[in-house]
Amino acid sequence: MKELIKEHQKDINPALQLHDWVEYYRPFAANGQSANYIPALGKVNDSQLGICVLEPDGTMIHAGDWNVSFTMQSISKVISFIAACMSRGIPYVLDRVDVEPTGDAFNSIIRLEINKPGKPFNPMINAGALTIASILPGESAYEKLEFLYSVMETLIGKRPRIHEEVFRSEWETAHRNRALAYYLKETNFLEAEVEETLEVYLKQCAMESTTEDIALIGLILAHDGYHPIRHEQVIPKDVAKLAKALMLTCGMYNASGKYAAFVGVPAKSGVSGGIMALVPPSARREQPFQSGCGIGIYGPAIDEYGNSLTGGMLLKHMAQEWELSIF
């Protein structure tokens, strides 16, 4: 019977399945809420839910509110980490930021104080991302951001736009991040000035994207930094592999262990409701997505961890239904 069910599932159009799953999970947004502690993020429609899945040959399937623009927030930490490694080299970066998961909140300061010498645990938490922002090449926030934008343009084929209202909203409420930055400056992990670093970090978080954009980045990472549509290596292979490992172990805030265990794909979330995920080619032996894929999801209602509530449900469902886990 199981074999018959599997044969039947092969005949079902993945696009139709995605549409059905999106509409099934959309009402669950009522159990979460948008990140209204950042005023500009609290203005969105919480019931939005969309997904885009991109394959190496350029085939794209999507459903729901897939073309809605949103700010990358913590998804951008993957990009800044890649940019820092490409410009400074992996040893230089890892001398300043570790690769260990932490059970603390993403904006916590406690481990910086109790674990000397105060090295941030990983680049996916705010302390680590601030440190990364400070070591991007350039003598000013403008130059550092220009380098970051150039990396983004290489990946998605267009220069990212900054959502000025979100940036201003975060700038005016960045009290915890300022505290983190000053502590990192005092312990000599922050290489730029505090306000300069904050500008870089908050503007990278305010970069606008769609599910298609982050699905493309996920696809490139799935292929170890190789852009399968442009047939070009755009991220060094060792950097891409390290970024994927960090996404798997640290990418979903304090729920990273749960996602690794029950979803089983590298993923990175942001408090705006985005999730960037990927399935490497080696993960599947049959369709769909036998050649790997990138996944972009948007659902602004977030859970207690800061992850998209409906987006996480959708990702878990499709990973289990299509057996996408890398384990």
Curated annotation (Swiss-Prot):
Catalytic activity: L-glutamine + H2O = L-glutamate + NH4(+)
Aminoacyl-tRNA synthetase keyword on record: no
Keyword Iron: no
MF (Gene Ontology): glutaminase activity
EC number(s) from the headed UniProt entry: 3.5.1.2
Residues annotated to bind substrate: S74, N126, E170, N177, Y201, Y253, V271
GO BP of this protein: glutamate biosynthetic process; glutamine catabolic process
Enzyme class at the top of the EC tree: hydrolase
UniProt keywords, alphabetically: Hydrolase
InterPro entries on file: Beta-lactam/transpept-like, Glutaminase
HAMAP family documented for this protein: Glutaminase
Subunit structure: Homotetramer.
PANTHER family: GLUTAMINASE, GLUTAMINASE 1
Protein family (similarity comment): Belongs to the glutaminase family.
Name of this chain's protein: Glutaminase 1
